Amino acid sequence: MTRPNNSTLKNVAFYAACFTFSVALFVALAVAGHVYPFGDNSFLTNDLKYQYIDFFAWFRRVLLCEANLRYSFSQGLGMNTWGLYSYYLASPFNLLCVLFPADKLTLFVFTTTALKLGCIHISSAWFLQKRFGLPMPAAFLLSLSFTFCSWTISNLRNPLWIDCLILLPICAYGCHELIRKRRMIRLVIATALNVMFCWYTAYISILFLCIFVLVEFVDYAAEEGFSWKLMLDRALRFAGAIALGLLLSAWTFLPTILAMSKGGPVLALGPLLKTSLKSLIRGFLPCMWVNNESTPQFYCGIIMMLLAVSLLVNRKVSIKTRIATLVVTIILVASSVLSPLEYIWCGMRVPNGFYSRTAFLLSFFALWAAGYALQKLKERPAFRRAHRPAIIMPLLALTAIELFANAHVMWNQLYVGYSEEANSTYVATATDTITAIQDQTSASFYRIDRTTTRVDSAALNEGLALGYNQLSSYSSANNPQAIALLNSLGYSSVGEFSTRYAEPILAVDALLGVKYAIPENAPAGYVLAKTNQTDSESAVYENPYALSIGIAASSDIQNSTLKSENPFEKQNDLYSKILGREVELYTKIEATSTENSDSLQQWSVTVPASSIGYLYINKDATAGSYWPVTLTIDQRTIENEAWRFDNNIRQIADASDAPSQHTVSIGVAEGYTDMPQDNEPVFYALNLDVFKQIMNELKASEFVPTVFKDGRIEGEYTAKDDGNLLLSVPYDEGWNITVNGTAVELTPAADKGLSSLNVQKGANRIVMTYKTPGALAGLAVSLATTVALVAAELYARHKKSRR
């Protein structure tokens, strides 16, 4: 038996110390900030509370075989969830969620964050030792600075991005090995893992490595001499390594690309400059970061930054290397300043929030430059004593205090205003409400939605977490055509990638199978459900008109494009195409303007008898997503309307036997000094007699499935004639369908937000199963690449052994 030598034990102890120190510092931050589990300030902040916590709950259900990894009906109208998995959840750390109860997932997030920080410290310390041969104390100090740089601390709210910081040092050392030793395998494997864990940060990392490898090549060529043959050889090896990494990860990368490439809203490129000179300078200073979307997170420890700068004036370093270092530094700083560069780094898309997403690259490059500078300083006799404990320990203590102070200032801005107790209470109440509905309903298909969320108006993924089918969705990985359809029908702002069910819309709810609503106010057309909920915020209402998953429809709906004047006319057009004749569910109400000023506009509206009155605000083209108004309907006030999450059809009044008079006004929203002057409210009435007649007609030809679960629909449908069956399932190429054992094609409907299939007169046995597009092809590519790499390695070893 081989016993570990002292060097091995020393290394293990060193990396254990790195891990433990980072975890301890992280825990100390939580204690100082009274952050859960050491206080009531929840660790859930920003997108952690809006998105991730529900995604983790869903992933936990997937791992426990309670949900399907490939497809879910719990977001929008349904979606391919491979993009959701690969973008948000592919980190191996997330497998630990099964070890935590459903009501302790905040603790799971906190625990995995601590583990990731410890691993970043280990990875970056390993890189410094391997690349520059730094002694342990110096490697410990610099890697600690990288681990707790401003970018990391501010982006713990985006767990999917953090794994990249573990792999980036390994990728960088792979570049060094490739240039110096012509070895590719480390870079190949690290690139593959990077893509597997999060393709988004992998793209950013690969783009950076294309620049970083040039610096390593310049440094190597400065020592060994330049030749075009050498450059071509290394360029081909680098390109080959990246390509092989992508091929190895094709099992997840290919289906991800297919899932995420369906289009969707694209933000316009903003102003050329993303920040001001003052904010840019603040970004380099400790304790000066401001959570205002304009302060870049460049700070990464004063000692490390000074060492990095010293490399530029160190004459022991080749002038070519120093120039290359300066050029890359300028590019990385400019990437957080200039919109076009940010656009390139973020996948040729304008990022929505979380400014300076690439600042971690500058922090890593500072780590590399500081390590290089220390390597050169170590060669000077005068600096050899600097690595002694008497000198390095005070520097380490000062660095730790400085990093802690900076992180504490940032946490005081990020981890406030949301109580973990309030979060736990809401989840428990919501779970009880949904369970009560599910226990009393035997139907295989129905949808549920609610107008209140866990926090603010953006926690819209509760269906995924609790296992029910909802319309609301807030995710960068969804079915964009379904979201676009929902928003255009009046559920949210047109052009947004999210949908919020802010208020029931009877006619669309019925068509899409929303049988239960949990609203703040009693919705017109609904009846109180028998769920015995005493809490008014959890009162459940039942939609007696809700249709099943499929209905007979005319051929007009196939490959149809709906009119887009406003949501009411769009609904009229949708129902007309379904029925094959012109119908007017909604009629326009003429409103009389009673006041029109820059700060207040008011109308008097008369709702006809036997009709539900609604309004919708067509937004001013200049209003964008973040310029709301205050909407008042009689005595009811909605503080923020016509903005990102609240641009919805709103109920004016329930139906009555006689016409009713109402006052509607829009004014300046709280926190704003003015309002968009060209916001245009439109007023319509839903004719209940026409609506009920249409519902009776559609209910006579419903397809009621016997099996309805994520990724699978089965059932018998009896058609009166050969015709078309409309499904409230978004069109997706991944559906495989048989009717009476014969394969049939799904056809797009309603701007691809719905789908349809042809059926024959009489009995139709329908079976729909979902297979992730690209999954089998990607797996085949990954397996073939793995076999080829193993064969190449075995051949190389065999060839070497014969020499």
What residues fall within each predicted segment?
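Active-site-proximal, structured, solvent-exposed surfaces of multi-pass membrane proteins
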Residues: 2-8, 55, 582-803
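Signature aromatic-anchored transmembrane alpha helix within multi-pass, membrane-resident enzymes
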Residues: 243, 377-406
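Extracytoplasmic/lumenal acceptor-recognition loop(s) of multi-pass membrane glycoenzymes
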Residues: 401-421, 438-509, 547, 552-578, ...
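Membrane-helix boundary/interfacial segments in multi-pass membrane proteins
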Residues: 42-45, 152-162, 271-296, 330-384, ...
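Membrane-embedded helix bundles of polyisoprenyl
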Residues: 22, 113-131, 136-220, 234-257, ...
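Start-transfer (signal-anchor) and selected internal transmembrane alpha helices
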Residues: 1-35, 233-237, 395, 787-803
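Membrane-interface coil-to-helix junctions
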Residues: 25-121, 144-166, 204, 260-265, ...
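Membrane-interface helix-loop junctions at the exits of transmembrane helices
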Residues: 27-36, 62-66, 96-103, 137-158, ...
